[in-house]
Amino acid sequence: MDAESVEPFLVYLPIPQRVVVLVLLGLWLWTWFLKVSVSYYDVSKVIVSNESTGLPYFNTSTKIHQSSLKLFKSISRVIIPWQLVCIILFQYSFTNNVSNKLLWFFLNVSPLLELFYIFAMILRSSAMVARCFKRILWVADIEPKPYRNNYIIISDTLTSYSKPLVDLAIYATFLFHDPTNVKCQVERYENAISLNIDVLVGVLPSLVRMIQSLREFTRGRSQKKDGSQLFNAFKYAGNIPIMLVTVYTRYYNLGPLGMMYWFMFWNSAYSFWWDVTMDWKLELFDFVNGDTSVNNNNSSNKADGLLRSILLYRKNAWYYSAMALDFILRFVWFWEYISGHSVFYGELNIFWLQILEIIRRWIWLFFKVEVEYIATTEGGKMDE
């Protein structure tokens, strides 16, 4: 294969290897989230862990952070050198047209083995995480509190990784078809796309969250709770029309692209409103609920009608910045559409957008977990 016909970025970071990078990024951001959050509240009241402190002067929240940091370091010590060796070998072999099939088999299968190692380490490190993953992937289950937040964090994180999962699925299809092919890591396998494997994999995380929301709606109705989870299910269902239009356009030269953009706009707008109003319980766009468990007393924050009465992170600017960033990142596709330009070109731009979505999810996590902590410690009823 001619190296000049491939984007330079793919030679430096092949598609499956960048999925590995994104997983490492997510683990690092999770560890950073814990480091920051434990300074403000006890995360262990929201996130259930099977860890025991072992030391009386360490609270459980600190122990969770230390365990996560230890896990991240253990994974990084193996994966980063492994990945660097594979990338250097790939660059040399690809640019010099090396045709050794055994070498290419090793290079092509390595990203899959790296990911297998990462997730094996994660699941082995925590029986609780393994339990949640098993129930999520098997029947899209979600247990009630105190385990509910574990399921939400994992499942919503998977939705932010939907596009990297698509890349992984296309690469894996190519790998199983021809594991010694030079193009396996730099080309999107046409057979996988023609079979719409990318669409099916891309919509799965949203389907899981939709089913979980419907389960909670059914559970809540029997307990005479509000029906907010039904509207949460609508949010995740918003991805389905986009996927259907994508499939349609593949079989017809002229598809309803205008309709797809309208679906995308509605989905981004509704998801942004849900993040701010329902997940973070901020009042800026709260046109539905006049009162919640985190907005049930008089304070300067509540009086301005923009935030809420209890703010654990203290500085109002952090909340306004989070709302602004969430809005920008939810609509990043729209800015590219109306401008006709992207920040980068081709696969590098795709990688950039995937990084931004993971960062958006990281920002979301701070305020979602904060709200759940307030609801738990204040003892008030909170809309789930």
Swiss-Prot record:
Domain (EXS) ranges: 189-384
Intracellular or extracellular location(s): Endoplasmic reticulum membrane
GO annotation, cellular component aspect: endoplasmic reticulum membrane
Keywords noted in UniProt: Endoplasmic reticulum, Membrane, Protein transport, Transmembrane, Transmembrane helix, Transport
Transmembrane among keywords: yes
Bilayer disposition of the protein: Multi-pass membrane protein
Protein name from the UniProt record: Protein ERD1
Organism encoding this protein: Kluyveromyces lactis (strain ATCC 8585 / CBS 2359 / DSM 70799 / NBRC 1267 / NRRL Y-1140 / WM37)
Upper classification of the organism: Eukaryota, Fungi, Dikarya, Ascomycota, Saccharomycotina
